[in-house]
Amino acid sequence: MRLQKGLYYISLQVCVDITMDVVAMLVKDIGLNVEDDYTNIKKLLKHDVITKDEATLLKQYNRLRNAIVHKYDKIKLRSCKRRFKKN
């Protein structure tokens, strides 16, 4: 069970990493300088590439990824599942 939870967290982290890479590519594609994830999300919102709801969701995913990276063993799997089921 512990290994399964670990794989779940790693999968979430990788998905968010890939998503943030796509965000950075979109920022570059519209001719702007790529910065940190949160700034990149704000730039896409400002230039109407994404909606406010999409920006909020991307920020939530990014926070979740950061929590996974920094507090890997302290995150409750149930909490992660609830957050993703909402979306």
From Swiss-Prot:
Keywords: Hydrolase, Nuclease, Nucleotide-binding, Phosphoprotein, Toxin-antitoxin system. GO terms for molecular function: nucleotide binding; RNA nuclease activity. The active site is at 65, 70. Modified by cognate antitoxin MJ1547; probably at least 2 successive AMPylation events occur on Tyr-72. Its EC number is 3.1.-.-. Coiled coil: none annotated. It holds the Pfam family HepT-like. The modification O-di-AMP-tyrosine is found at residue 72. Belongs to the HepT RNase toxin family. Homodimer, probably forms a complex with cognate antitoxin MJ1547. This is Putative RNase MJ1548. It comes from Methanocaldococcus jannaschii (strain ATCC 43067 / DSM 2661 / JAL-1 / JCM 10045 / NBRC 100440) (Methanococcus jannaschii).
